[in-house]
């Protein structure tokens, strides 16, 4: 397997927080492996300082790590694949160090710099608020809605919708029920639900 494509939305962070994604220059597989072995890999990773509202699109095969003091909302391709090359000495439920997957990671990792530009669109005015495209790929599409009143979304039969609340409270009203929400709530809306109001 070749990993999974992900998108990170920074919900909140402490001052000076940062994360890593991709390499800051081209590497050979040999150098990549040596840097893992001698614990100098972060020297050649792209380090990004973050602020609330930042968006990072991480293609499969891109090495990445979230630093301390960051709360993200992660949207990802449906895949259970994770290859660890470093794990901060963390232990699993059994008390043993979690498995590393260095050889597999070397085989599938993208060892050229990633596109680090911000891809999110500009907010557009819609009835009841604004909508902004954050990321779109074959596996998912993400949009950010800022609601100042009532916003209507059409959940077609093409896909379900996952609503993640980062700020504020309110309710989602569908044709058959309504659900109240608050920050950090995540709501699943089945495909074909039709028009819902937030």
Question: How does the language model describe each region?
Answer:
Residues 172, 196-198:
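Hydrophobic beta-strand residues in large extracellular and virion-surface proteins
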